[in-house]
């Protein structure tokens, strides 16, 4: 998992509340067991005018020119502004996979659905909760300034505007540690690889008959 320390990126404003996981990545794309290939179908039913199917060439599909991510000014955005209860609905880890593969490093909203919030941390996507008034200010700034960028400083737990205004955000210390060091569940386990190896050696020495078939 890529470490997240500090990120400055173009901001896209998704001014919708209660965006659910089926809107983030529709159900027909969940058949794959891989973690890749979901970015092109992020917000599929909003980005395109037809119905998407797995394996289709999206370059030939008609775009919904009224959807914010299709606006030229937001191409390459890596910070997403959203409204309350982002990521609600069914539990699917594909939702943060799709956001991450599209290019988003952080999503900023007044609130998130619990399961989506937890899944995001496990997949290197930083969900940031800010107050409604702070979100309103960010939406206003973003909509009024083309090429608007924000800096997300995870170490300092600050979102910094171009004019120098900063917003503090809270994050669990363990989750912060994992993101700063790029540690997913596998990475955390590998930190104890030496201890695991010592246990296996001791276990094999004490009960060798359990390992006969492995020799």
Swiss-Prot record:
SUPFAM superfamilies: LeuD/IlvD-like. It catalyses: (2R,3S)-3-isopropylmalate = (2S)-2-isopropylmalate. GO terms for biological process: L-leucine biosynthetic process. Its EC number is 4.2.1.33. Gene3D superfamilies: Aconitase, domain 4. It comes from the Bacteria. Pfam families: Aconitase_C. GO terms for molecular function: 3-isopropylmalate dehydratase activity. Catalyzes the isomerization between 2-isopropylmalate and 3-isopropylmalate, via the formation of 2-isopropylmaleate. NCBIfam families: leuD, PRK01641.1. Heterodimer of LeuC and LeuD. This is 3-isopropylmalate dehydratase small subunit. The lineage of its organism: Bacteria, Pseudomonadati, Pseudomonadota, Gammaproteobacteria, Lysobacterales.
């Amino acid at each position: 998992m890529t470490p997240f320390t500090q990120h400055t990126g173009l901001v896209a404003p998704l001014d919708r509340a209660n965006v659910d996981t089926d809107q983030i990545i529709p159900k027909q794309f969940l058949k794959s067991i891989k973690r890749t290939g979901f970015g092109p179908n992020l917000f599929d039913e909003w980005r395109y005018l037809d119905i998407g199917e797995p394996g289709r060439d999206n370059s030939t599909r008609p775009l919904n020119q009224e959807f914010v991510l299709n606006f030229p000014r937001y191409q390459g955005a890596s910070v997403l502004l959203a409204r309350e209860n982002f990521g609600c609905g069914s539990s699917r880890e594909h939702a943060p996979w799709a956001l991450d593969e599209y290019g988003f490093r952080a999503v900023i909203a007044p609130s998130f659905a619990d399961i989506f919030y937890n899944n995001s941390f496990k997949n290197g996507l930083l969900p940031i909760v800010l107050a409604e008034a702070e979100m309103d200010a960010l939406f206003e700034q973003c909509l009024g300034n083309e090429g608007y960028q924000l800096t997300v400083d995870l170490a300092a737990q600050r979102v910094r505007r171009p004019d120098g205004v900063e917003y503090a955000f809270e994050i669990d210390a363990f989750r912060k540690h994992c993101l700063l060091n790029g540690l997913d569940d596998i990475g955390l386990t590998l930190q104890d690889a030496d201890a695991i190896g010592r246990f296996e050696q001791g276990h094999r020495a004490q009960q060798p008959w359990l390992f006969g078939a492995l020799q």
